[in-house]
Amino acid sequence: MTPPATNTAAPPASLCAPEKGSRRAEIALVAADQFTWRGYHSTRVEHIAEQLSVTPGALYRHVPGKYEMFRDAVATLVTALETASEHTSDVGSGPPPLEELVESITRTTWSHRSRAALYRWQARYLTPEDRAAVREVDTRVRRRLADAVRVRRRQHHRDPAGAGSAAAAMLSCVASLGQHRITLSEDEAVSLMTSIAVDLALCDGSASGVTSDATNGVPSGQATGRRTDAASGASSVPRLRGGAATREGAITAAIARFHRSGYDSVTMEAIGADVGVAASALYRHFPGKSALLTAAVDRTATLFEDLLDTHAARHTSGADPAVALQDLLNEYVTIAFSHGPDLMLYLSELGALSAEDRQRTREAQRRQRNRWADLLVAAADASVRATRATGSPSTESHVTESHVTESLARARVHAALAVVLDGGQGTEFHPAAAARFGQLAGHILIPHRPG
C-alpha cells in the first residue's frame, strides 16, 4: 500500500482525534471496542476502565466524561478513514486508481475491524454538530471514490451515471468487514474488496432511481434520525383502544420508536401513546421494555426465516442456483425497503438484549447468512462448470477469484446485504432506490465484470 500523504486535511474542529500515541488515544481505541460491542447507553466508564486495568477516576484525568470518550472513539475512526482515502498516488493530479483507494480504505478498516462498525449504528448518539462533522468526512471520502469510479467508467467507455451510488456501495462493503468475524487474512480482505469495487465500478447506472451522485445515501450507515413516514413506521402504527392494544400493534410502535430514538431513549409511555393506550395496558402483554425489544427482534428473525424457507420450498434442488440466488436477493430487497426499521433494529440494538437473547439472535443471524452463502457457493460452482464447458479460461478465472470458498462467500453475503440496507437507510428507504441498490448487491453476489 502506498504510504498515506503527510499533508492530511484536518477534520472539522469539533471532531478532532486524540494525538496518536497519547494516553487519550489509547483510551479512545478501548472505548471504541466497548461502545461497538455493548452500544452507547449500555457501556459504562467502568467497562472501559476495566479493559485498561485502571479505575474510572484514572480515565477522568485524561477525558472529562463518557460522551467525550465516545466522541474520541468516533473521531479516531473517522480521521483514519479520511487519511486512508486521500490522494496517495504520485502520477499526475487526477484521482488515484480505484484499486489503490479501495486497498488503502480496506487496510485501514481492517486495522480497526473490532470497532469498525461503531458509527455505523451508534452515530445517532453524537451531538448534531459532531454528527454533521462525521457526515462531512463521509461525503469527502465518497466523493473521492466516485471520482475514481468515473475515471474507470470512462476508460471502459461507460456512462459515468451511477458513480456516486457505486462508491457508496463500495464503502458499505468495506464497512461490512466490521460486522462479522469470518476468518480472513488481511490480504484476502483487500483482494475481495478490490475485486468487488471493480465489479461495482462497471455496474450500469441506469437503475439509479433517486440515488443520484448528489444524494446516494450514507455508505457507512450513519443514522440521521430522519425517515419518511413509510420508513419510520409512523403512518403504519395502528391507533388501538382498550382490548385492541394487541401484541403486534405494540411491537410495531416500539420498532418505530427504537429506530428513531434508540432503545434507551424510549419509554413505555411513549410507545403506549403511539398506539393510543396507557403504558399499563402494554404491561398486560409485556413485562417491560426489554421484552418488547426481544419480541421485535424475534419477529424480524422470523421474517428472515420465513423468507428463506419459502424461497427454499420454491426452488428445488434441480433449480439453477444463480437464478435462485437472484430471486432471493430480489425478495430481500423488497423486505428491506418495506421493513427497513425492523432490519435496522435487528442489527443495531443487540447490545440491549440479555446475554442469552443476544447469543440466540446472533446464532440465528449466522444461520441465515450461511444459507445465503451455501446458495452463493452453489451458483459460483455452477458458473465454473459452465465456463469450463465453453472453454473460456479468462471468464473462469474471474468467476473463481475470491468467490467460491465458504469464508469468502459468507463475506460477500455480508457485503451485499449491507449495500441494500445502507442504501435504504441513506435514501430513507425510498422505493425508487430499491432497484439500484438491489442491482449493486447482485454484482457483489454474482460478478458481472466483462472478460
Please place each PLM-identified region on the residue numbering.
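Generic hydrophobic, amphipathic alpha-helix propensity
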Residues: 23-31, 48, 73-77, 81, ...
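Amphipathic alpha-helical segments used for helix-helix packing
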Residues: 109-131, 336-356, 414-421
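Helix-turn-helix
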Residues: 26, 30, 34-70, 261-291, ...
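Conserved small-residue-rich
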Residues: 171, 235-304
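Amphipathic alpha-helical packing segments from all-alpha helical-bundle domains
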Residues: 128-154, 356-384, 388-391, 397, ...
